């Protein structure tokens, strides 16, 4: 949880993530399903709520189970943003409406960041690009260390219009394991 609180502190600086919608928002993405996006998102939502911030959760895609968990953690209904079923205009309108009274918005991605119905259509990357939401990647670090460097590099550079601002490592085995992962980020 200490990493969640570091991220919460980052979100509380109003100049860092300002866009046309609101000051602070993030999309929680990953390289694949099973990386820990939902668990991390729920912890982040609760940590932000515990700081007395008005948190608005969103979920990429048509998922109805994660949105129920979001509601319990954030204290308000989570809204689906579905690039396959909704027009770009509708997604923008929903996002603007639901973030208008929020201090911070957290959008949980679906599957891997670039996975969608037809290439990237309906993907988390599509939503991030459309709404200009910075991305934090949740990385499954089990059985890997410095090899995350090219993974992170690829995610940061695959689409220059997206803003990958950080990574959270899940399944970290020890302090020395974490030091390898941190070095990979810095390089």
Residue ranges and their predicted role:
Residues 171-187:
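GTPase G-domain guanine-specificity segment
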Residues 20-35, 39, 45-131, 139-166, ...:
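ATP-dependent carboxylate-amine ligase catalytic core
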């Amino acid at each position: 949880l200490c990493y969640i609180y570091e991220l919460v502190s980052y979100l509380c600086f109003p100049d860092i993530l300002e866009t046309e919608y609101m000051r602070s928002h993030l999309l929680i993405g990953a390289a694949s399903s099973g990386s820990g996006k939902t668990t991390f998102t729920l912890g982040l939502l609760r940590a932000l709520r515990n700081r007395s911030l008005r948190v608005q959760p969103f979920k990429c895609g048509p998922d109805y189970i994660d949105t129920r968990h979001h509601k319990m953690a954030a204290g308000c209904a989570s809204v689906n943003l579905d690039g396959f079923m909704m027009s770009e205009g509708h997604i923008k309108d929903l996002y603007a409406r639901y973030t208008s009274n929020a201090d911070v918005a957290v959008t949980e991605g679906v599957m891997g960041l670039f996975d969608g119905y037809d290439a990237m259509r309906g993907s988390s990357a599509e939503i991030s690009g459309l709404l200009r939401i910075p991305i934090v990647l949740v990385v499954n670090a089990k059985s890997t260390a410095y090899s995350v460097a090219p993974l992170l590099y690829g995610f940061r550079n695959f689409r220059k219009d997206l803003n990958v601002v950080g990574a959270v490592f899940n399944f970290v085995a020890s302090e020395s394991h974490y030091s390898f992962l941190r070095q990979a980020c810095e390089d």
